Structures are given as C-alpha cells and as structure tokens.
Amino acid sequence: GYEMEIIVHADSEIQSPSEIKGRTMAFTSPTSNSGFKAPSAILKGEFDLIADRDFTPTYSGKHDNSILGVYNGDYEIAAVANSVLQRMVRRGVIEADKIRTVYQSPTFPTTGYGHAHNLHPELVGKIKSAFFTFDFDSDPLYKKEFAKADRFVGIRHKNDWAVIRQIDAANGVSYDCK
C-alpha cells in the first residue's frame, strides 16, 4: 500500500493542513485518489476546509509535477502519493530533506489488477499464476524502481477497498453497478 501525504517545502512556515486557509494547494487531477479525492475528504472531514471556499485548488497533472512544484517553490502545498515521492528520492530526482510532510493518511491499497467474473476458470488460474509467480529479482530496473515490492497479493474488494469507497462517499461519489 501507500499513503497520501500533504507536503510542503522544508523551509515552509506551514506546519499543519489547517494552515492552508487562504492559500493555493496543488492536486494532481480530480480523478486521483491520493492526489485529490482522499485529501479533499480529509481536509473537509478533519479540518473543515473545502476547496474554493477556504483555499484555491490547482492541478499539476501528476504526482511528479506536484512534488517537483513543492520542491522548486512553485507550489506552497500539495497532496501526493508517498510511493511516488519515495521513488523520486531513490532515483536522485529530489533531495528528501527539501520536502516536509504535514499530514500522512492511513495506508491505501495500491494498484489492483482484476479479471472479469465470467472468465473461464482455467484462464483465471493462469492469470493468477503469472502474477503470483512473478520473479521480482529478475529485473534490476524493476527492483530499483519498486524496491519495496517483492510479491503480488490477493485482495478482496469488500475489505481491502473499503477506504476508497468511504473517500468516494465523503466526496459525494456513488456508483450504480449493474
């Protein structure tokens, strides 16, 4: 999993999300969980802060842009996935001591891969086997980029994605699955 972090430049006077009132905050895109949906729900629920009412939202397009924007002083504050931040530090793109976290969320499930419910069971078995037997050590570039990953794990939508559904509900998003 990963966490959503609200970050500022290390030299920033901001110590808490409550201090963003009247400022501009960078998000990635409106469809991003950690780059918009989760921070919006958290800011509203925990700090009574709502975009356009209490602060001005801006969109960077992706987590890397938000991180670089804070790092270079283009954005005062941003919401990002810390897995992206950690990879940028490992690759030497940014120096860790130039960024400071003022909020970290609970852990969210990471990217999920699924299959259609009506696939032939034999094909489902082969797909699962391909994932669960993947050799993470066979590719040095993969190992460098995803240093913490050492296996795929099975997930259950009902339990493991509950936090994502709660965030969507807090943001007024509902699904009509048929």
Question: Where in the sequence are the language-model features?
Answer:
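Sec-exported extracytoplasmic/periplasmic mature domains
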Residues: K44, D48, Y71-E76, R90, ...
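Bilobed "Venus flytrap"/periplasmic-binding protein-like clamshell domains
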Residues: G1-L68, Y75-I77, S83
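A bilobed periplasmic-binding-protein/Venus flytrap-type ligand-binding module shared by bacterial periplasmic
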Residues: E3-I14, F108-E122
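An extracytoplasmic/periplasmic, membrane-proximal ligand-sensing/linker region
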Residues: G114-H115, L119-K178
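Short secondary-structure boundary segments
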Residues: N82-S83, H117
